[in-house]
């Protein structure tokens, strides 16, 4: 792995966050538990929404797609992480690393864009309730989701193709658990200025513009809520947005901890922040959305009761 320029057929070594066998065992069980909780939580959300016709609304349509994205997101990284934590062979092929990177970038982008669309849905529901049914028609919902997928696929494809132009020299040891773009760029020995430029340009378009849109949407939502005369009405309106606002804060907070810093200062200590957005956020989303949501509680109850009844009969 050391010395010289290396071809596309070579491998990277994912050394993880620690080389201590004891710490690796702890990390294995921790990530396995988090993965199982994430899968269970997101699958239950998807099944509850799809099985209950009362939840066939734009808000829950996008929530189900967000859960699907989170499910795919953790499955892209955690299984390989678990294998590496239990194995002496920590190699990942060049093609495997780029494939993992592509899905990582695409799914983070998809999460971000779906959150922006969900903010628009809440804005229309609270600020323009009389026009909600026509404004958020099934056709528009499918169109918005399709655009989210198109932009996400393109974003991941652009940066993955740019990564194929990067030359890696010397050690290909990645002191982390999966192929993350900043760690890969730190191993480059060729000129990566174009990667920086495109990353900044596309990042502003894909992340900062949706963030600005969400901030503007919630500013209008807050103004609309403050104009509601009754305290009960204010509470009900705010409760429909609180969970989404919490998820947005968690998503952008952890993402900002990783990417809002110069590439040269990026180090393994920042891997904790990467774990936050790559593992913790997808795990927490189902709990945040269902914590005080009576509709989700009811749908989950009916789903589980139906499964139990089927077993009895």
Swiss-Prot record:
Principal subcellular localisation of the protein: membrane
- Subcellular location, record wording: Cell membrane
Annotated glycan sites: 5, 195
Q: Which InterPro entries match?
A: GPCR_Rhodpsn (IPR000276), GPCR_Rhodpsn_7TM (IPR017452), Olfact_rcpt (IPR000725)
One of the record's GO molecular function terms: G protein-coupled receptor activity
List all topological domains (Cytoplasmic): 50-57, 121-139, 220-236, 292-313
| Keywords for this protein | Cell membrane, Disulfide bond, G-protein coupled receptor, Glycoprotein, Membrane, Olfaction, Receptor, Sensory transduction, Transducer, Transmembrane, Transmembrane helix
Q: How does it sit in the membrane?
A: Multi-pass membrane protein
Cysteine disulfide links:
97-189
* Organism domain of life: Eukaryota
Described by its record, this protein's role is as follows: Odorant receptor.
Q: What is this protein called?
A: Olfactory receptor 1D2
């Amino acid at each position: 792995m050391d010395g010289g320029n290396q071809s596309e057929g070579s491998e990277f070594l994912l050394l993880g966050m620690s080389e201590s066998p004891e710490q690796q065992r702890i990390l294995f069980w921790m990530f396995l538990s988090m993965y199982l909780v994430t899968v269970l939580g997101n699958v239950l959300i998807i099944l509850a929404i799809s099985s209950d016709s009362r939840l066939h609304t734009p808000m829950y349509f996008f929530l189900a797609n967000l859960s699907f994205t989170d499910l795919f997101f953790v499955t892209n990284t955690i299984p390989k992480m678990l294998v590496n934590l239990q194995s002496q062979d920590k190699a990942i092929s060049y093609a495997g690393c780029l494939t993992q990177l592509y899905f990582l970038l695409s799914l983070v982008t998809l999460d971000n864009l779906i959150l922006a669309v969900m903010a628009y849905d809440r804005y229309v529901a609270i600020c323009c309730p009389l026009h909600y049914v026509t404004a958020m028609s099934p056709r528009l919902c499918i169109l918005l989701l399709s655009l989210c997928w198109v932009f996400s696929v393109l974003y991941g494809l652009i940066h993955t193709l740019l990564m194929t132009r990067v030359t890696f020299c010397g050690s290909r040891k990645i002191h982390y658990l999966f192929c993350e773009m900043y760690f890969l760029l730190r191993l480059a020995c060729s000129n990566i200025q174009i990667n920086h430029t495109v990353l900044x340009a596309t990042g502003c378009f894909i992340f900062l513009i949706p963030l600005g849109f969400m901030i503007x949407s919630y500013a209008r939502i807050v103004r609309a809520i403050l104009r509601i005369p009754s305290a009960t009405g204010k509470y009900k309106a705010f409760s429909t947005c609180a969970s989404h606002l919490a998820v947005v804060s968690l998503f952008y907070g952890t993402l900002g901890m990783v990417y809002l810093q110069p590439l040269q200062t990026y180090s393994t200590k920042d891997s904790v922040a990467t774990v936050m957005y790559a593992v913790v956020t997808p795990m927490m989303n189902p709990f945040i959305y269902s914590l005080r949501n009576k509709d989700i509680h009811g749908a989950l109850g009916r789903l589980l009761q139906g499964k139990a009844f089927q077993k009895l009969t």
